[in-house]
Amino acid sequence: MSNFKFSVGPWNVNTGEDAYGPATRKEIDRDEKIRKFAEMGFSAIQFHDDDAVPNINDYTEEEIKEKARALKKFLDSLGLAAEFVAPRLWMDEHTADGGFMSTSAEDREYAMWRAYRSIDIANELGAPMIVLWLAREGTLCAESKSPVWATKQLIDAINKMLDRKSVV
């Protein structure tokens, strides 16, 4: 028989709040979710950067790494691995217009800061990869930005991530 392995993200168990209405149930603590995932037989956990380090914007780079190391110890104690870390760029005011393709240099810099922190967190957790969900990237309104320029910004951002020294 094959030995299948499955992973899950903390966001898979949420309050039920969406574009159609408010929350329908109470929030469950991240660590409680992870403990339950281990009991259910999951092998790995998928993380957004702010799942791994809640309130990530409030911490320095070193504090973020410290919190990620503490999470790694917790995962290890449960026999779980981290599958990947992804920057959650679509939930911040800096990235409402797409962080990497924003016309705002400040917003593009913020998106890179979050991407670099995701790489740092992945390294601390021993996650073999990051995932880049480009949820709000693009040129939906053609008049808002040049598609060629915006695509170049995205390519430059990805190249910067690839150039960053890491195990990911």
Feature-to-residue mapping (PLM):
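Conserved small/polar residues in nucleotide/adenosyl-binding loops
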Residues: 167-168
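N-terminal pre-domain/capping segments
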Residues: 1-129, 148, 152-163
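Short, conserved phosphate-binding/catalytic loop or strand-edge motifs used
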Residues: 132-139
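Flexible, glycine-rich active-site loops centered on histidine and acidic residues
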Residues: 139-147
